[in-house]
Amino acid sequence: MSKQLVSIIDVPKHIGEEITIGAWVANKSGKGKIAFLQLRDGTAFFQGVAFKPNFIEKFGEEEGLEKFDTIKHLSQETSIYVTGMVKEDERSKFGYELDITDIEVIGKSQDYPITPKEHGTDFLMDNRHLWLRSRKQMAIQQIRNAIIYATYDFFDKNGFIKFDSPILSSNAAEDSTELFETDYFGTPAFLSQSGQLYLEAGAMALGRVFDFGPVFRAEKSKTRRHLTEFWMMDAEYSFLSHDESLDLQEAYVKALIQGAIDRAPQALEILERDVDLLKKYIAEPFKRVSYDEAIDLLQAHENDEDTDYEHLEHGDDFGSPHETWISNYFGVPTFVVNYPASFKAFYMKPVPGNPERVLCADLLAPEGYGEIIGGSMREDDYDALVAKMEELGMDRSEYEFYLDLRKYGSVPHGGFGIGIERMVTFVAGTKHIREAIPFPRMLHRIKP
């Protein structure tokens, strides 16, 4: 049997040709003289059909019956080489199918644990290494891949340089209570929460930089939106205003959505994602509303029949129900800007004339997906940043390199970060972030 293989995703290019596919058996059915195989190879799913008379005619009765019997008894996830003629078939949901003419078993599969029946979440997570083979899980990972590809493409086209920040650090970029600590040859070190502080150094050297890699948050949160290890893209840029930063973030998110539509259309179809709705998010401008305007809206509607969130005063932080209501109210991704300085990071620059608010923005995704981007302008004045750190009782010695950036040619600069898994969850339309990463790390899960 020829081993010049064709990927399932490329099968439509070979209508009327005999091809060979390397695949796994996702499922099988049939009776009597016919057998149906659901095949997958990592690029797509496809159906093959085997007819007993055709095998007898080609190989003779003894060998033909033996091969057909092999097909009928293939177990789930057996790996095979399968050869056949690609034929158009309107009855098939693919529009075509493979008329199987030969088969070779590569690797047998016995007692595969994830059968077509329903399984509980814990069971599926315990078998995550196998669950990834399922139709929907494969589709989610294809969307993840499309979003990562679109990330690199977007920043390359916009003049950014990939800049790698360290995973191990002696300081915290965000909340120091959420750090994973480790021993670094007798000195305390921490797994990175964000590459932002180092990216600011990169922006002072290279103008526009971004990084993409794993970050770690020791949050004891057990929600559908939290992971303890996830992949983050951080971007930093010099000589860009707050409004220009929001424009860039909006263009980036739209590029990610378009990238998924262009590169993973079959995956979106498998997940039954409303592509017209995704296209709406691309076509319409994102809404921008200030924190105080958002609080006013929440207070005005808190007694509405369909609302389900707690009362907030100006100065309170949003919870997930508030974020959901805000984004659903506007119906498109929504920037909430200028939050109170009291619960935002020390490095954020105050709003001119209003030191109680900072030049920052969170992008809230509609359909209940909540925050997907957080960003701000950074305090570029040395004395102001030192005063803020002293006000918060921070140890300046841990941030000397960061303060140096304000001493030697400081400029207006800002940046933002996006958790890729949250973006994947939003674009894919899935319910839980654990499915947006191959092997999720959560509060009570560190394996497989």
Swiss-Prot record:
PROSITE patterns: AA_TRNA_LIGASE_II
Record Pfam families: tRNA-synt_2, tRNA_anti-codon
UniProt-listed Enzyme Commission number(s): 6.1.1.22
Top-level taxon of origin: Bacteria
Primary location class: cytoplasm
Subcellular location: Cytoplasm
Keywords from the UniProt entry: Aminoacyl-tRNA synthetase, ATP-binding, Cytoplasm, Ligase, Nucleotide-binding, Protein biosynthesis
Group of enzyme by EC: ligase
Any one GO cellular component localisation term in the record: cytoplasm
Gene Ontology annotations of biological process type: asparaginyl-tRNA aminoacylation
UniProt cross-references to Gene3D superfamilies, sorted A to Z: Bira Bifunctional Protein, Domain 2, Nucleic acid-binding proteins
Catalytic activity from the UniProt record: tRNA(Asn) + L-asparagine + ATP = L-asparaginyl-tRNA(Asn) + AMP + diphosphate + H(+)
Database matches in CDD domains: AsnRS_cyto_like_N, AsxRS_core
GO molecular function, one term: ATP binding
Family: Belongs to the class-II aminoacyl-tRNA synthetase family.
Oligomeric and partner information: Homodimer.
Name used for this protein in its record: Asparagine--tRNA ligase
Source organism of this protein record: Streptococcus thermophilus (strain ATCC BAA-250 / LMG 18311)
